[in-house]
């Protein structure tokens, strides 16, 4: 579907603009080739069409070329649509491979056609909902870092991030139906989360211990040679457990996730119980970000107890 959308968009622009097509799988070699091709062609504006990886590639290309970019999302699976950041995994790969961090900007414009987005796989909607609910624990982690580590904190950005989560949770049942109006609600909330990150100047309003848990799962999945669960699904499961540690109403969060059709157990998400527990024990090491996990993290027994008491594993 993504390619068809991109081709339709290019056809509508070609009478007035010179179009350079760049198709990429999202690998680092493809990224470097795309940068070289774009530089030779004196590109003025980039248009990213697709889900998470194509939009991340567009952001990096725009940063490297020093040009503006527009995004055309074809799914509502994550809050990176409007954010001034790329996925943690891709950012880490680039830093390890090239020894530097690429700073990206938020898009100049977002063209989100809900008719197109509504055709995406049902799991993308569940993933997007899970990514939004995660703001509840992310903001609490941010508040904790502000109080204990004097980390910069924006009440405005935090409030906007929590509002995005609230909007999604208030419409959990409608979002599960995937009617076009509910898709519009989900997309607006995801964009709102991205704007909150732009205001804060970091991903703090949207990413805390629950995302670190998800990143840990990504690493363990890669090491085991298995495909990880969708980002928002992993984050949703992490949110349930981190909310428990934070003393928040984790049962209400779990109920809303279930109402939206989001997997809330390791079995439903296709993740092994052992991997869930292992990810909990290493999540605090994933990045330099203070959260409810503290600097020492969870012991193996504490991690297993947490996963069991919240019903994530049996």
Swiss-Prot record:
It catalyses: sn-glycerol 1-phosphate + NAD(+) = dihydroxyacetone phosphate + NADH + H(+); sn-glycerol 1-phosphate + NADP(+) = dihydroxyacetone phosphate + NADPH + H(+). Keywords: Cytoplasm, Lipid biosynthesis, Lipid metabolism, Metal-binding, NAD, NADP, Oxidoreductase, Phospholipid biosynthesis, Phospholipid metabolism, Zinc. Binds 1 zinc ion per subunit. Its cofactor is Zn(2+). It is found in: Cytoplasm. GO terms for cellular component: cytoplasm. Substrate binds at residues 79, 131, 215. One of its GO terms (biological process) is glycerophospholipid metabolic process. InterPro entries: G1P_dehydrogenase_arc (IPR023002), G1PDH (IPR032837), Glycerol_DH (IPR016205). Zn(2+) binds at residues 131, 211, 231. Belongs to the glycerol-1-phosphate dehydrogenase family. This is Glycerol-1-phosphate dehydrogenase [NAD(P)+]. It comes from Korarchaeum cryptofilum (strain OPF8). The lineage of its organism: Archaea, Thermoproteota, Candidatus Korarchaeia, Candidatus Korarchaeales, Candidatus Korarchaeaceae. The gene is egsA.
């Amino acid at each position: 579907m993504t390619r068809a959308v991109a081709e339709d968009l290019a056809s509508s622009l070609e009478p007035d603009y010179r179009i350079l097509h760049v198709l990429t799988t999202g690998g680092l070699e493809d990224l470097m080739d795309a940068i070289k091709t774009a530089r030779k062609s004196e590109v003025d504006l980039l248009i990213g069409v697709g889900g998470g990886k194509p939009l991340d590639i567009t952001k990096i290309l725009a940063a490297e070329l020093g040009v503006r970019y527009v995004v055309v999302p074809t799914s509502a699976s994550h809050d990176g649509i409007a954010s001034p950041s790329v996925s943690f995994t891709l950012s880490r790969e680039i830093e390890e491979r090239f020894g530097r961090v690429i700073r990206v900007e938020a898009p100049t414009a977002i063209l989100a056609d809900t008719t197109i987005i509504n055709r995406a796989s049902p799991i993308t909607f569940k993933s997007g909902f899970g990514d939004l609910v995660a703001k509840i624990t992310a903001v609490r982690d941010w508040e904790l870092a502000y109080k204990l580590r004097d980390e910069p904190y924006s009440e405005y950005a935090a409030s906007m991030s929590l509002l995005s989560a609230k909007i999604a949770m208030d419409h959990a049942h409608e979002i599960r139906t995937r009617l076009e109006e509910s898709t519009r609600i989900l997309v607006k909330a995801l964009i709102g989360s991205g704007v909150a990150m732009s205001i804060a100047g970091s991903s703090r309003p949207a990413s805390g211990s629950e995302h670190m848990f998800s990143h840990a799962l990504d690493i363990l999945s890669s090491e085991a040679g298995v495909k990880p669960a969708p980002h928002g699904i992993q984050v949703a499961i992490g949110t349930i457990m981190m909310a428990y540690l934070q003393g928040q109403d984790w049962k209400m969060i779990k109920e809303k996730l279930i109402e939206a059709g989001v997997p809330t157990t390791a079995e439903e998400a296709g993740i092994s119980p052992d991997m869930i527990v292992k990810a909990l024990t290493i999540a605090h090491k994933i990045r330099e970000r203070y959260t409810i996990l503290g600097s020492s993290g969870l012991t193996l027994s504490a991690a297993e107890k947490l996963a069991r008491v919240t019903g994530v594993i049996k």
